[in-house]
Amino acid sequence: MDFEDDYVHSTCRGAYQDFNGMDRDYGPGSYGGLDRDYGHGSYGGQRSMDSYLNQSYGMDNHSGGGGGSRFGPYESYDSRSSLGGRDLYRSGYGFNEPEQTRFGGSYGGRFESSYRNSLDSFGGRNQGGSSWEAPYSRSKLRPGFMEDRGRENYSSYSSFSSPHMKPAPVGSRGRGTPAYPESTFGSRSYDAFGGPSTGRGRGRGHMGDFGSFHRPGIIVDYQNKPANVTIATARGIKRKMMQIFIKPGGAFIKKPKLAKPMDKMNLSKSPTKTDPKNEEEEKRRIEARREKQRRRREKNSEKYGDGYRMAFTCSFCKFRTFEEKDIELHLESSSHQETLDHIQKQTKFDKVVMEFLHECMVNKFKKASIRKQQTLNHPEAYKIIEKDIMEGVTADDHMMKVETVHCSACSVYIPALHSSVQLHLKSPDHSKGKQAYKEQIKRESVLTATSILNNPIVKARYERFVKGENPFEIQDHPQDQQIEGDEEDEEKIDEPIEEEEEEEEEEEEEGEEAGSVEEEGDVEGEEGTAEAAAAGEADAVGEAEGAGEAEEAEEEEEEEGTQEFAAQACATEQCEHRQM
């Protein structure tokens, strides 16, 4: 029996030496050449391999163990030993461990009680080998990184809770990441002991007496560094403190931001009323903008012909046609009335204002009809346009004029064939585009209505309309002079004031952050502007902005109409399409 024991002992010792490359005694009280006896809370006293094997195989009983005496001190069986990634005989605690004094003074025997099993399950101890091999040098960890009192101040987890509930007690902020001196905020990728963290650890309570046990790492006494503890605690609660003050005031922070550009505009434009130099510069700028608008219209006329301005449009419904009957039916249709009702609901305008807006569209249709009639009275101009359409086209180009159908919702041209139109009507793309386009029309109709009411010319007409007069009445002037005067008024409404447009676009971009709250505020402000116009009060800045907004809406309509006009080719309603 002695021979067999000696053989087993020598074989085991040789295997250990080959595995570690050096002669080590893996007794429960030793690690890396340092002899420890955790059972008695002191160093020294190298234990023999005989005593270790006898203890491991249950051949020798020690006091204080009970059922767990067959396992060595601090080597009670748990899920750690069944997982790979570490030495199965390596002690679970490394250098500089305070457990030898804390647990040695708190518990008796060899610490084989249920507390040992409970404590061993904490902090990712059973997460495999990743929690036993530190990938980073301990010297790089922030001082006090693993100190227990830093966790005591803001951890609400109990010391004997489930391992799935308690986070790994690493990192000063409880996020499972160490703070390295190389980076201000530390890395967010790895756990201090390798592998992922077991939890975020956002608790803010106090730990129990046993929940603040040490983990392997550098131990620093925080009693000499109270400032660090305060900083760590303040760091943990800083975000919640910020949210308390930011969230309630979030809606109020944007309003001053939106008001600042208006204040700047008022301050910059108020001197123009008294400074003649600024007035001259403003006039030159306006003339330059008008000239640019004329060049733009000439360019569109050269590209699409003059007929694109002959279309009948409804600015609110984005309806466009070349037939008088169609526009007449639209202005009396339920869809047009629904758009007006939506505008009234969003803007809170009274019935008189809505009637005035409807009359504006009717008057626009009448003026377009007069312009078109005058154009048709000069057939030579129409022939020139028709000739220019096919100019340069030869038989080798394989091009011809065909009739098409334009879908504004999908922005596509469809061949004027029954099968093609029906196929597009039943397509899912058209169904989705139709709903989206309808919502877009409703949103833009509100902006168009408020922009029109801000125009100074429209304000004057509204004042006459409220008094019971007809602001669109055609007087007994010669027809040519009346049309010229109306066109001048329309040009004033349509003239772009591009600098104001840019400022308005910036305000709109900022206003989108505020959402519907800002939109309602703008609408109410514009309603007040309309009422002020009825009383004869007009603000210079508001007039300039209104003119720019009205012109912008009209220009968008004209740009949209150019594509449709190109498809219909003036009165013939035809466009060019390539046939290969």
Curated annotation (Swiss-Prot):
Region (Mediates transcriptional activation): 1-124
Induction or repression: Upon retinoic acid treatment.
Main subcellular location: nucleus
GO molecular function terms attached to this record: DNA binding; RNA polymerase II complex binding; zinc ion binding
Modified residues (N6-acetyllysine): K247
Taxonomic classification: Eukaryota, Metazoa, Chordata, Craniata, Vertebrata
Record's GO cellular component terms: DBIRD complex; nuclear matrix; nucleus
Name under which the protein is recorded: DBIRD complex subunit ZNF326
Function per UniProt: Core component of the DBIRD complex, a multiprotein complex that acts at the interface between core mRNP particles and RNA polymerase II (RNAPII) and integrates transcript elongation with the regulation of alternative splicing: the DBIRD complex affects local transcript elongation rates and alternative splicing of a large set of exons embedded in (A + T)-rich DNA regions. May also play a role in neuronal differentiation. Able to bind DNA and activate expression in vitro.
Recorded coiled-coil stretches: none
The encoding gene: Znf326
Record bears the keyword Ubl conjugation: yes
Similarity section: Belongs to the AKAP95 family.
